[in-house]
Amino acid sequence: MWYYNDEPYEIALGEYQGFVYCITELTTNKMYIGKKGFWSKKTLPPLKGKTRKRRSVVESDWMKYYGSSEVVKQLLLEHGADNFRRDILYLCKSKAEMGYLEAKEQFDRNVLLDDRYYNGIINCKVHRNHIKGLHSNHNSI
């Protein structure tokens, strides 16, 4: 179950591309900060008599997602999903917004130096023009 503003969140809204999240291991309170898209592109075979492959946008596996961290994935296998809480920090309208807010949250929380986090890397490339509509009123919960 994902939570947003402490309420269960189950619907991928069309206006949003994805979200920035915090996954917390409940026994140790260690966390992982990441991002996940609501949508993914799927390549379909060409229509009969055509040669060009088709692209389709489908809902991603976000409901079942527990992050890209190998450590978190292993803990999930060992202890089960009930040992984790998944919180959505920001709903994002673009991939650039997701990338920017994920990196901002990771730097603000000092995830690479603070032992309370599983994050092992901060990887981000965002161009200023891609986030012009983003204002500094994004506050994490």
Predicted segments with their positions:
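Structure-specific nucleic-acid interaction/processing domains
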Residues: M1-I141
